[in-house]
């Protein structure tokens, strides 16, 4: 096989792979937090700390963009058998695809990043030096978000949560 024939083969394979990659992105939603969480949403999930039992929870959320452009998300979280806990997020875009946020239960600034249909968040929790790492994936239907969280102490995972969020707007 000549060098030019080999080059043509490689170019055709590369073109096919690029076409397949582009096609796989068609129909996939982009995670824009202020759009995804605008309005009302409901979440159901489970959290487990250390080796303890799994604790079911529900979350009712209401999100809106404020006059200054920041996005506010008010949440009521209920763990089974416990009173409702209210918390509030205030999020803003710092650069394209990058976010900062404050959260009632965080001891410092939360940072986030979007990549296609995924949002990743990281923030320190109040007390004990705990850090929450969350990965939220917007499904292809555009109405469901799957949230996986890992709670870490000194980098060691000590708890996790899984939640399915239904967007009802």
Please name every model-derived segment:
Residues 18-26:
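Bacterial Sec-dependent signal peptides at the C-terminal "C-region" and cleavage site
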Residues 1-11:
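Bacterial N-terminal signal peptides that target proteins for export
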Residues 26-40, 140:
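N-terminal helix-cap/turn-to-beta initiation motif at the start of protein domains
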Residues 136-144, 148-169:
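Edge beta-strand at a domain terminus
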Residues 9-19:
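Bacterial N-terminal signal peptides
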Residues 27, 31, 44-135:
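Central antiparallel beta-sheet cores of small beta-barrel/beta-sandwich binding domains
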Residues 37-45, 147:
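A short, Trp-centered hydrophobic/proline-enriched beta-strand micro-motif
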Residues 34, 54-56, 129, 142, ...:
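Short coil/turn motifs at beta-sheet boundaries
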């Amino acid at each position: 096989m000549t060098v030019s024939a080999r080059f043509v083969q490689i170019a055709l394979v590369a073109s096919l792979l690029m076409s397949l990659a582009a096609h796989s992105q068609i129909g996939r939603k982009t995670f824009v937090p202020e759009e995804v969480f605008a309005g009302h949403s409901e979440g159901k999930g489970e959290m487990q700390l250390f080796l303890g039992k799994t604790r079911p929870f529900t979350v009712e959320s209401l999100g809106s963009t404020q006059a200054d452009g920041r996005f506010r998300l008010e949440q009521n979280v209920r763990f089974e058998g416990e009173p409702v806990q209210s918390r509030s997020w205030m999020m803003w875009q710092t650069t394209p695809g990058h976010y900062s946020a404050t959260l009632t239960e965080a001891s410092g600034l939360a940072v986030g990043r979007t990549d296609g249909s995924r949002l990743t968040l990281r923030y320190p929790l109040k007390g004990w030096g705990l850090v929450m790492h969350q990965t939220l994936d917007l499904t292809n239907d555009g109405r469901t978000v799957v949230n996986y969280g890992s709670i870490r102490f000194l980098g060691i995972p000590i708890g996790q949560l899984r939640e399915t969020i239904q967007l009802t707007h």
